[in-house]
Amino acid sequence: MEKKETKSESEKTNKQDNKNTKSQKKENLNLVNSDKKIAELENEISNLKDLYLRKQAEFENFRKRLEKEKDNFVKFANETIMKDVVNFLDNLERAINSSKKSKDFDNLLTGISMIENEILSIFDKKYNLKKFGENGENFDPSRHEAISIEEKEGLKNPEIVEVYQKGYCYNDRILRTAKVKVAQSKN
C-alpha cells in the first residue's frame, strides 16, 4: 500500500510540477510580452518627444520669421509715400535753383503753387489725405479750432473769416484741426 500511496503522491507531485511549469511558462510569456510592450511604449514616447521638439523648433522658427516680416513691414510701410515725397523735393529743388538764376518772384510763386497743388492732388488721390479750412466755410468745432471770434450782422451760422493754419484729415480722421478766426451773429 505504501507503493500505491507513493505512486499517487508522485503523480500528484508531477501534476503539481506540471501546473507550476505551465504557470511559470505563462508568467514568463507575460513578462516577455510586458517587456516588449514596455519597449514599444518607450520607443513611442521617444518618437513623440522627438516630434514634439521638432514641432516646437518649427513653431519658434515660424514665430521669428513672422516677427521679422512684421518688422520689415513696419520699416518699409511708408516706402511708397517716401518715393512721392522725393519727387516733390526734386520739384522744390528745381524751383529753388530756377529762382537763383532769375529774380522773377512771380514765376517762383507760380512754380511753388504748382508744386503744392501737385502734392495735394497726389496725397488726395493716392492716400486720401485732404486739406480743409477755407474762408466762408461754416464753423465746425470738430474740424476747426477757433483762435479768435468776431461779431458780424446777419449770420445764421458761425463761419470762418480767416484761416491761420489749414487742417488735414486722413481717411476721414482728423490729423490736425484748422486754426481759424470765426465770425458769429451779434445775438
From Swiss-Prot:
Cell location: Cytoplasm
Native organism: Borreliella burgdorferi (strain ATCC 35210 / DSM 4680 / CIP 102532 / B31)
UniProt cross-references to CDD domains, sorted A to Z: GrpE (cd00446)
Pfam family for this entry, one: GrpE
Stated role: Participates actively in the response to hyperosmotic and heat shock by preventing the aggregation of stress-denatured proteins, in association with DnaK and GrpE. It is the nucleotide exchange factor for DnaK and may function as a thermosensor. Unfolded proteins bind initially to DnaJ; upon interaction with the DnaJ-bound protein, DnaK hydrolyzes its bound ATP, resulting in the formation of a stable complex. GrpE releases ADP from DnaK; ATP binding to DnaK triggers the release of the substrate protein, thus completing the reaction cycle.
Homology family: Belongs to the GrpE family.
Record-given protein name: Protein GrpE
Gene Ontology CC annotations of this record: cytosol
Alphabetical keyword list: Chaperone, Cytoplasm, Stress response
Lineage: Bacteria, Pseudomonadati, Spirochaetota, Spirochaetia, Spirochaetales
One annotated GO molecular function: unfolded protein binding
PANTHER family to which the protein is assigned, alphabetical: GRPE PROTEIN, GRPE PROTEIN HOMOLOG, MITOCHONDRIAL
Subunit organization: Homodimer.
Gene3D superfamilies: 3.90.20.20, Head domain of nucleotide exchange factor GrpE
UniProt xrefs under PROSITE patterns: GRPE
GO terms (BP aspect): protein folding
UniProt gene name: grpE
Region span, Disordered: 1-30
SUPFAM superfamilies for this protein: Coiled-coil domain of nucleotide exchange factor GrpE, Head domain of nucleotide exchange factor GrpE
